[in-house]
Structure formats: structure tokens, C-alpha cells
Curated annotation (Swiss-Prot):
Gene3D superfamilies: 3.30.160.20, 3.30.230.10. One of its GO terms (cellular component) is small ribosomal subunit. With S4 and S12 plays an important role in translational accuracy. The N-terminal domain interacts with the head of the 30S subunit; the C-terminal domain interacts with the body and contacts protein S4. The interaction surface between S4 and S5 is involved in control of translational fidelity. PANTHER family: MITOCHONDRIAL RIBOSOMAL PROTEIN S5. It comes from Shewanella amazonensis (strain ATCC BAA-1098 / SB2B). The gene is rpsE. This is Small ribosomal subunit protein uS5. Residues 13-76 form the S5 DRBM domain.
Length: 168
């Protein structure tokens, strides 16, 4: 029974492979090559997670990354396929800026950031990456920005006002 539920839960997630990289460890006898994989998973409805896996073979690295991504999922409050307000995120040398966009705009984002936004269920957004464009750091900065986004209900609760007063 538990396996069936886990299989169903896994099936409704979108998975995206962002990057595969060959890395090496230098030892006395030469080099030992291995592979790293960066992946994101999401349900297309506000849940998103990223994973980074490392193994001697590419498929094993991808599988490890997918498992880590499923374990590290966060929930993001979305507003009809876009963001509630402009947000900034940063991780090490990478900084990202994202702002809500009107219906029909699409996802204006590059590379790794686009993959995160697609699996999270964001359909209309304007974004820009500053500083380092290392895919790992961009993914982490994007997830950081999305987790710091507040819905009007959260802001209203914090300020002790109603949602209508917050929206103006």
C-alpha cells in the first residue's frame, strides 16, 4: 500500500535535469572521474525542490539528485500563475530578481532559473540573474527568493489587518 502511494506521489511531479558535469579527483595513480547532476522537481502547483547528486556514472548521479530534490521540497504561494510581489534572492555570488507579470507574458528567465519556475507552476514572470551564473547557485538563489515571497494573507496576519486593506 505504501509503495503504491509513493509511486502515485512520484508520478505527479515534473522532473527537470539542469546540468550534468564531469569532475575528477587526482590521486597518485592518475585521475578518478565522476559525474554530478543538478535537478529540480515540482508539482506545477507551488511545490518545488532541487537536488545535487554525485556518482561514478551519469544515471546514478541523476537518480541521486532526483531523490534529494524530492526530499527537499518547499511550498511557494502563487498568485494565478505568477508571483505576489517582486522578490530578490541570493546565494554566494549569485543574485536573482523576479517580478510578477501580466497574463500572456510567459517565463522571461534564463537557463537554470527557468527550469525552477516551470516546475514550480509559475507561468508569467520577469526575472534577471546578476553576478555569478553558476547553475547551482542560480537554482539556490531562485528557491531562496521564492521561499521569502509572502502572500497577502500572510502580510495581513503579520500586520493585524484584513486582506482587503493590504490589497488597497
Amino acid at each position: 500500500m505504501a509503495k503504491v502511494e509513493a509511486q502515485q506521489q512520484k508520478d505527479d511531479l515534473q522532473e527537470k535535469l539542469i546540468a550534468v558535469n564531469r569532475v575528477s579527483k587526482v590521486v597518485k595513480g592518475g585521475r578518478i572521474f565522476s559525474f554530478t547532476a543538478l535537478t529540480v522537481v515540482g508539482d506545477g502547483n507551488g511545490r518545488v525542490g532541487y537536488g545535487y547528486g554525485k556518482a561514478r556514472e551519469v544515471p546514478a548521479a541523476i537518480q541521486k539528485a532526483m531523490e534529494k530534490a524530492r526530499r527537499n521540497m518547499v511550498t511557494v504561494e502563487l498568485n494565478e500563475g505568477t508571483l505576489h510581489h517582486p522578490v530578490k534572492g541570493r546565494h554566494t555570488g549569485s543574485r536573482v530578481y523576479m517580478q510578477p507579470a501580466s497574463q500572456g507574458t510567459g517565463i522571461i528567465a534564463g537557463g537554470a532559473m527557468r527550469a525552477v519556475l516551470e516546475v514550480a507552476g509559475v507561468h508569467n514572470v520577469l526575472s534577471k540573474a546578476y553576478g555569478s551564473t553558476n547553475p547551482i547557485n542560480i537554482v539556490r538563489a531562485t528557491v531562496d527568493a521564492l521561499t521569502h515571497m509572502k502572500s497577502p494573507a500572510q502580510v495581513a496576519a503579520k500586520r493585524g489587518l484584513s486582506v482587503e486593506e493590504i490589497r488597497g
